[in-house]
């Protein structure tokens, strides 16, 4: 915590908030630009420039810590900027940039107003940046709602299709219900403790809470809200429908930014609030993890829609990540291992959904989401098929990919903390997942259909979206073979947490 004068404190606060301020400023500029003149290229470029400036400003914030010799900066009681928040802010901004690159060609064929897409995306990104830096439940709620409200519009952006409208309405209704649970749980905690900051709640939870039913009920309500947002069983039923109905770039954003930001916020909350002091909470988390892994993987087996399949797959992946939450106070390396898994999941998801976006651009009605659309892709787009194969193998956790390193680290955490049921569940779930990931992979190399329904442009590898897919595949391979630079990079950030 900083002990300098008020003026210096204010200056450091503003510097620490630089990425958030830049994204917020870009939102204002974009609104003015849209009001002045609708120009897709200009407004899309403004969005990308703003996000790049926010990304590079993270280096300035990182340098601020070394210059000021502080481990963290508390920006009001709501936000805490440290290595942890800088790392996850970087992942959020990278995923938002990737979404912009996938969305631009898709919007080129869109028959209505295009610029609002970038505005909604920026507001949602702003919420994600607030969420990963939150140290107060009020900031958590603000961040979650800033992510969710623009997503209602993004999910229904292809409103000419009934499925897109259905996805938006389903997410709206269920998200509102989950937010109600979250808010009611926070109210219960406040009624019992008189505070909502993570520090004050942590002090309460370090005492015995058996005799405080409001705290137990409040934590249960909050767990329901978090479970919905992370699409964990039994709050997951919206996920496949929303993934399938949303436009491909929005599915990319929802599956990466939305979930990664929330997981970062939830993990920071549980860093202060030890789960082992709350009766039944670890048991509930373990049940949600096991059920999510089995449900997600088993339901994905029979899917013929790639976006729906990835929706079920994401349920399983965040079931795996629950190991990190359960073992948070039992393994000193758990933050680094979860971060490696998040990086692997991010780049693998960007790669697969990036290929779907490339195949679906420009807008021509329904996305190229049927598995049949990818049959024989190798025979007319061999490099794209190779890239997609790498990403699918990484999601499956096959050796020589980053996904294998990430899953190995999570298994190591489960073994070190004696979570034997979860260890067995991860092994069985991974074996099931191997089938449906290989099913997609094999179809890429089968004989192609006589007529191609959807295809990428011939110069896809030189487009912005193609470059993102290339880079993602390269990182997944390089860090899968030699992960030490990534691990050292992550440890450097966690040293300031």
UniProtKB/Swiss-Prot annotation:
Q: Which InterPro entries match?
A: NADH-Q_OxRdtase_suN/2, ND/Mrp_TM
- Its domain of life reads Bacteria
- Transmembrane stretches, by residue range? 14-34, 45-65, 86-106, 116-136, 137-157, 171-191, 215-235, 253-273, 281-301, 309-329, 338-358, 385-405, 420-439, 461-481
Q: Which Pfam families match?
A: Proton_antipo_M (PF00361)
Which GO biological process entries does UniProt record here?
A: ATP synthesis coupled electron transport
Name the reaction it catalyses. Answer: a quinone + NADH + 5 H(+)(in) = a quinol + NAD(+) + 4 H(+)(out)
UniProt keyword list: Cell membrane, Membrane, NAD, Quinone, Translocase, Transmembrane, Transmembrane helix, Transport, Ubiquinone
The reply to whether Transmembrane helix figures as a keyword in the UniProt entry is yes
EC number(s): the record gives 7.1.1.-
Where would you find this protein in the cell? Cell membrane
| GO cellular component assignments | plasma membrane
Q: Report the GO molecular function annotations.
A: NADH dehydrogenase (ubiquinone) activity; NADH:ubiquinone reductase (non-electrogenic) activity; quinone binding
Subunit structure and binding partners: NDH-1 is composed of 13 different subunits. Subunits NuoA, H, J, K, L, M, N constitute the membrane sector of the complex.
Name the NCBIfam families for this protein. Answer: NDH_I_N (TIGR01770), PRK05777.1-1 (NF004439)
Q: What is this protein called?
A: NADH-quinone oxidoreductase subunit N
Q: Its gene?
A: nuoN
């Amino acid at each position: 915590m900083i002990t300098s004068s008020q003026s210096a404190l204010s200056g450091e606060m503003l510097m620490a908030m630089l990425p958030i301020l830049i994204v917020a400023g870009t939102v204002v500029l974009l609104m003015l630009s849209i009001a002045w003149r609708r120009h897709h290229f200009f407004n899309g470029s403004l969005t990308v420039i703003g996000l790049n400036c926010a990304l590079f400003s993270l280096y300035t914030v990182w340098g601020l810590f070394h210059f000021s010799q502080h481990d963290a900066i508390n920006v009001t009681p709501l936000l805490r900027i440290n290595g942890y928040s800088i790392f996850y802010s970087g992942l959020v901004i990278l995923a938002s940039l990737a979404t912009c690159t996938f969305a631009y060609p898709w919007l080129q064929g869109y028959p209505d107003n295009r610029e609002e897409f970038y505005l909604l995306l920026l507001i949602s990104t702003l919420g994600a940046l607030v969420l990963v830096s939150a140290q107060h439940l009020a900031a958590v709620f603000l961040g979650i709602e800033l992510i969710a409200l623009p997503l209602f519009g993004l999910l229904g952006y292809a409103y000419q299709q009934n499925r897109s409208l259905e996805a938006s309405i389903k997410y709206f209704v269920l998200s509102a219900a989950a937010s109600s649970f979250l808010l009611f749980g926070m109210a219960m905690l406040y009624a019992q403790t008189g505070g909502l900051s993570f520090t004050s709640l942590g002090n309460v939870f370090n005492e015995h809470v058996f005799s405080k039913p409001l705290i137990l009920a409040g934590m249960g309500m909050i767990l329901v809200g978090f479970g919905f947002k992370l699409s964990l069983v039994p709050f997951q039923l919206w996920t496949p429908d929303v993934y399938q109905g949303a436009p491909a770039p929005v599915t990319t954003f929802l599956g990466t930014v939305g979930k990664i930001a929330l997981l970062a916020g939830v993990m920071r909350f549980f860093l202060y609030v030890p789960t082992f002091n709350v009766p039944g909470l670890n048991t509930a988390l373990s049940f949600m993890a096991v059920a999510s892994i089995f449900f997600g993987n088993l339901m994905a087996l029979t899917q013929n829609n790639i976006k729906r399949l990835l929706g079920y797959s994401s349920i399983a992946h965040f079931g795996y990540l629950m190991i990190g939450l359960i073992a948070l106070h039992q393994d000193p390396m758990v933050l680094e291992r979860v971060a490696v898994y998040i990086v692997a999941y991010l780049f693998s998801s960007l790669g697969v959904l990036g290929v779907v976006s490339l195949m679906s651009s420009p807008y021509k009605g329904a996305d190229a989401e049927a598995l049949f659309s990818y049959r024989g892709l190798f025979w007319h787009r061999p490099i794209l098929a190779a890239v997609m194969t790498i990403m699918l193998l990484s999601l499956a956790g096959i050796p020589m990919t980053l996904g294998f390193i990430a899953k190995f680290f999570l298994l190591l955490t489960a073994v070190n903390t004696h979570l034997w049921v979860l260890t067995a569940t991860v092994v069985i779930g991974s074996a099931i997942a191997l089938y449906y990931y290989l099913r997609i992979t094999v179809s890429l190399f089968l004989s192609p259909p006589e007529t191609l329904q959807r295809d990428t442009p011939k110069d896809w590898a030189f487009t912005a979206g193609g470059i993102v897919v290339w880079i993602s595949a390269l990182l997944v391979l390089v860090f899968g073979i030699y992960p030490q630079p990534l691990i050292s990079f992550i440890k450097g950030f966690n040293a300031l947490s």
